[in-house]
From Swiss-Prot:
Belongs to the influenza viruses polymerase PB1 family. Influenza RNA polymerase is composed of three subunits: PB1, PB2 and PA. Interacts (via N-terminus) with PA (via C-terminus). Interacts (via C-terminus) with PB2 (via N-terminus); this interaction is essential for transcription initiation. Interacts (via C-terminus) with human PKP2 (via N-terminus); the interaction competitively inhibits the interaction between the RNA polymerase subunits PB1 and PB2. It catalyses: RNA(n) + a ribonucleoside 5'-triphosphate = RNA(n+1) + diphosphate. GO terms for molecular function: nucleotide binding; RNA binding; RNA-directed RNA polymerase activity. It is an enzyme of class 2 (transferase). Phosphorylated by host PRKCA. Its EC number is 2.7.7.48. Keywords: Eukaryotic host gene expression shutoff by virus, Eukaryotic host transcription shutoff by virus, Host cytoplasm, Host gene expression shutoff by virus, Host nucleus, Host-virus interaction, Inhibition of host RNA polymerase II by virus, Nucleotide-binding, Nucleotidyltransferase, Phosphoprotein, RNA-directed RNA polymerase, Transferase, Viral RNA replication, Viral transcription. InterPro entries: RNA_pol_PB1_influenza. GO terms for cellular component: host cell cytoplasm; host cell nucleus. RNA-dependent RNA polymerase which is responsible for replication and transcription of virus RNA segments. The transcription of viral mRNAs occurs by a unique mechanism called cap-snatching. 5' methylated caps of cellular mRNAs are cleaved after 10-13 nucleotides by PA. In turn, these short capped RNAs are used as primers by PB1 for transcription of viral mRNAs. During virus replication, PB1 initiates RNA synthesis and copy vRNA into complementary RNA (cRNA) which in turn serves as a template for the production of more vRNAs. This is RNA-directed RNA polymerase catalytic subunit. It is found in: Host nucleus; Host cytoplasm.
């Protein structure tokens, strides 16, 4: 039986993969198929607001799911308002989070812990990955040197701030 308590954490597609024919697998896993795309996790938090007068109100607000991820819920157009700077900041933060997820794919489903900043963690990961790739022969010495130089430049710029 595919459906038991030990298999609850495994997606149904994975459980039934061997039972499907190839055509059905192709349709089911096609990212362009709107009927099988997965719903994004909405990042809405609740807060109890205490107004100056009257009872406390429970309100929803948009926020990032963690400090290292970005999934905005709202769909507002603020391009032609005084809020444009906020939108640009949000877009920059989104790019940073996407870059962080490239370095640490598990951050999309597991909250990162530790005291390092995003930049420190990414530089450290880049150095480790570059060393592994160089020692295994996947990259040349010039590429390895360039990566290390870029990491040093980033660290130097951080120290200057």
């Amino acid at each position: 039986n595919l459906y038991n308590i030990r298999n609850l954490h495994i997606p149904e597609v994975c459980l039934k993969w061997e039972l499907m024919d190839e055509d059905y697998q192709g349709r089911l896993c096609n990212p362009l198929n709107p009927f099988v795309s997965h719903k994004e996790i909405e990042s809405v938090n609740n807060a109890v607001m205490m107004p100056a007068h009257g009872p406390a109100k429970n309100m929803e607000y948009d926020a990032v799911a963690t400090t290292h991820s970005w999934v905005p819920k709202r769909n507002r157009s603020i391009l032609n308002t005084s809020q444009r700077g906020i939108l640009e900041d949000e877009q920059m933060y989104q790019r940073c989070c996407n870059l962080f997820e490239k370095f640490f794919p598990s951050s999309s489903y597991r909250r990162p812990v530790g005291i390092s900043s995003m930049v420190e963690a990414m530089v450290s990961r880049a150095r480790i990955d570059a060393r592994i790739d160089f020692e295994s022969g996947r990259i040349k010495k010039e590429e390895f040197t360039e990566i290390m130089k870029t990491c040093s430049t980033i660290e130097e710029l951080r120290r200057q701030k």
